[in-house]
Design a protein with these regions (language model features):
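Hydrophobic alpha-helical segments and their boundary regions
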Residues: 67, 169-170
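Active-site metal-binding loops of divalent metal-dependent hydrolases
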Residues: 7-11, 44-45, 79-81, 125-127, ...
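Extreme N-terminal starter segment of soluble prokaryotic enzymes
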Residues: 1-4
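Conserved catalytic scaffold of divalent metal-dependent phosphoesterases
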Residues: 81-169
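Conserved acidic residues
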Residues: 37-39, 140-142, 175
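Contiguous mid-protein beta-loop-alpha structural module that forms a pocket-lining wall or clamp
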Residues: 171-184
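Core catalytic region of metal-dependent phosphoesterases/phosphodiesterases
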Residues: 9, 13-112
Length: 184
């Protein structure tokens, strides 16, 4: 299975929308060219969570619809998509996902496991830490989806994160980890 991993899109309310559209078209073309089977977005589709503009909703809807038209698309929330300090506030993605009602668009808001063929996507949600779980079946390909900082992670540039919300050990039992939030 060929999986595309995207994170930290940070669509702004008013700025860079022409540039976003150009880059998004390049992403769509590449995903089609690569013939991906699955797309995963690991958080921070939005740049701000409390004051969203119609322009944000237009561009984010365009992005998510086109991703879902290409392949089944799974999205988790990042710290910019929802309000960690007020769980009763709506996040920045649910209204779009609900309005699109696209069969290939799956918003995974809570911690838990979603099985796609022989792959299990295990969401470790920053909004639902009390319900984190380990993979339920080691015969599957288990992929952790997490948006947050992780102590001890070394990036492709050699930078090592010496602080983090959680240690790297939270991913034990997973075959792969798809992250968001670390912009290096």
């Amino acid at each position: 299975m060929k999986i595309a991993h995207i994170a930290d899109t940070h669509i702004r309310n008013y700025k860079y929308h022409k540039e976003y559209r150009v880059i998004f078209e390049q992403i769509f073309d590449r995903l089609r060219e690569e013939q991906v089977d699955l797309i995963v977005h690991c958080g921070d589709l939005a740049h701000t969570k409390t004051q969203l503009s119609p322009e944000y909703f237009d561009l984010a809807t365009h992005f998510l619809k086109n991703l879902a038209d290409i392949a089944p698309t799974y999205i988790i929330l990042g710290n910019h998509d929802g309000n960690l300090k007020n769980e009763h506030r709506q996040d920045a993605i649910t209204p779009i996902a609900n309005a699109l009602a696209h069969n290939n668009l799956h918003l995974l808001k809570n911690a838990g496991e979603s099985v796609v063929g022989d792959v299990a996507l295990n969401v470790l949600s920053v909004f639902d830490e009390d319900n984190w779980m380990k993979p339920s079946d080691s015969s599957r390909i288990n992929i952790a989806l997490y948006h947050g900082s992780v102590s001890g992670v070394k990036t492709d540039t050699g930078w090592v994160m010496d602080h983090g919300d959680h240690p790297i050990s939270i991913f034990r039992g997973h075959d792969y980890v798809f992250l968001g939030d670390i912009h290096k």
